[in-house]
């Protein structure tokens, strides 16, 4: 394992017992439970028929895969060149860019009112494709940076585990929705509450585990890179899906799927490939990248929700326009004795004493 042009080994060591402490194990267990609960809840919003439709007409899935494995690795490679990163820094960022979509994309797609069926199909297809695409992309883009064979470092077992975590609870949720739909509201509400509580626990344990070690990667160029990478994914994923004329719901879904990477796989590759004295504090770069993913994703959700409140629905706009047009046309019609030409002029009728109105006038 050799990286070109590394000026000197990092004077850096991980916290004592890192990865084997009680807090580390507790964090891992809570993360798995939270992911299972999230996937179960998301499965309750899906339908087999709609999943089948996306598989039979995979236009959205193909666009998403092109965005995931075309845009993100290229963005990571170009950002490394633009900011003149060292080779070890560029390699750490490239590994993140070549990773498949993560589970956070499913949760944020729900918040963005995207197509949940497409989101789960995309996450599954992205993970399956990563078994072949990840080694290929790392081989192509790491030329001249890394002398070793990165394809042997791809955590195939981790990818398969992530697929199981997605598919099994989602399938249970779909079956519950079709067979026991009255349970779905309770699962969704309970899932949201428990997920929020677990998120608080995850945040607290992460701070305890990492401590101030993450401060070592908060250099200006790494901060800029880790902020621009997810932004590039969100933006280019939306633009690419718009070019292929997908509906707004699918555009938002592909945007989220492209911008969110599987950070756990990035950390695994860095941990397996490089010893601490080589990778140094860049071991924590995936965590910094995840922070920017979450922050930018939440900002996009806030902007989208505000836009929804300001802009009236299209149907309501049409109804208002038609009503206003009718009111403007009514006075002119009444002057001619008709309204829209459907009501004939009023004919003289008999008065109570048997005389018509003309005779009464005489």
Curated annotation (Swiss-Prot):
Modification Phosphothreonine occurs at: 330
Pfam families on file: SBF
Annotated stretches, region: Disordered: 333-362
TM stretches of this protein: 23-44, 48-83, 87-112, 116-142, 157-179, 184-217, 220-243, 248-273, 281-311
Range of residues in the leader sequence: none
Residue pairs linked by disulfide bridges in the UniProt entry: none
Subcellular location(s) of the protein: Cell membrane
Top-rank taxon: Eukaryota
Cytoplasmic side: 45-47, 113-115, 180-183, 244-247, 312-362
Glycosylation sites: 5, 11
Alphabetical keyword list: Cell membrane, Glycoprotein, Ion transport, Lipid transport, Membrane, Phosphoprotein, Sodium, Sodium transport, Symport, Transmembrane, Transmembrane helix, Transport
Membrane topology summary: Multi-pass membrane protein
Presence of the UniProt keyword Phosphoprotein in the record: yes
Tissue specificity of this protein: Highly expressed in liver and low expression in kidney.
Gene Ontology CC annotations of this record: basolateral plasma membrane; membrane; plasma membrane
Gene3D superfamilies, per the entry: 1.20.1530.20
GO BP term, example: response to ethanol
Stated role: As a major transporter of conjugated bile salts from plasma into the hepatocyte, it plays a key role in the enterohepatic circulation of bile salts necessary for the solubilization and absorption of dietary fat and fat-soluble vitamins. It is strictly dependent on the extracellular presence of sodium. It exhibits broad substrate specificity and transports various bile acids, such as taurocholate, cholate, as well as non-bile acid organic compounds, such as estrone sulfate.
Name of this chain's protein: Hepatic sodium/bile acid cotransporter
């Amino acid at each position: 394992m050799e990286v070109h042009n590394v000026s000197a080994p990092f004077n850096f060591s991980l916290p004592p017992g890192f990865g084997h402490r009680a807090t580390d194990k507790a964090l891992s267990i809570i993360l798995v439970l939270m992911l299972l609960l999230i996937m179960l809840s998301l499965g309750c919003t899906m339908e087999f028929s709609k999943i089948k439709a996306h598989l039979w007409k995979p236009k959205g899935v193909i666009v998403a895969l092109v965005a995931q494995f075309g845009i993100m690795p290229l963005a990571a490679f170009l950002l490394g060149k633009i900011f003149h990163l060292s080779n070890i820094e560029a390699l750490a960022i490239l590994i993140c860019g070549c990773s498949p979509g993560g589970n956070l994309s499913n949760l944020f797609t729900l918040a963005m009112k995207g197509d949940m069926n497409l989101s789960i199909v995309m996450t599954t297809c992205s993970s399956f494709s990563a078994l072949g695409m990840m080694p290929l992309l790392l081989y192509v883009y790491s030329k001249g940076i890394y002398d070793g064979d990165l394809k042997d470092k791809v955590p195939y077992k981790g990818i398969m585990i992530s697929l199981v975590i997605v598919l099994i609870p989602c399938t249970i949720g779909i079956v519950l929705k079709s067979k026991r739909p009255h349970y779905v509201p309770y699962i969704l509400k309970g899932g949201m509450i428990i997920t929020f509580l677990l998120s608080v626990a995850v945040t607290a344990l992460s701070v305890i585990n990492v401590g101030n070690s993450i401060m070592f990667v908060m250099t200006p160029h790494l901060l800029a890179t880790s902020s621009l990478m997810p932004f590039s994914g969100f933006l280019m994923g939306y633009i690419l899906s718009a070019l292929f004329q997908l509906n707004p719901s699918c555009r938002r879904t592909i945007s989220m799927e492209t911008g969110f990477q599987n950070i756990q796989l990035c950390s695994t590759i860095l941990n397996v490939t490089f010893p601490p004295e080589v990778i140094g504090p860049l071991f924590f770069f995936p965590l910094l990248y995840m922070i920017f993913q979450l922050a930018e994703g939440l900002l996009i959700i806030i902007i989208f929700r505000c836009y929804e409140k300001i802009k009236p629905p299209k149907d309501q706009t049409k109804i208002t326009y038609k009503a206003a047009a009718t009111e403007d046309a009514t006075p002119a019609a009444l002057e001619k004795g008709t309204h829209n030409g459907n009501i004939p002029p009023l004919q003289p009728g008999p008065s109570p004493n048997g005389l018509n109105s003309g005779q009464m006038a005489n």
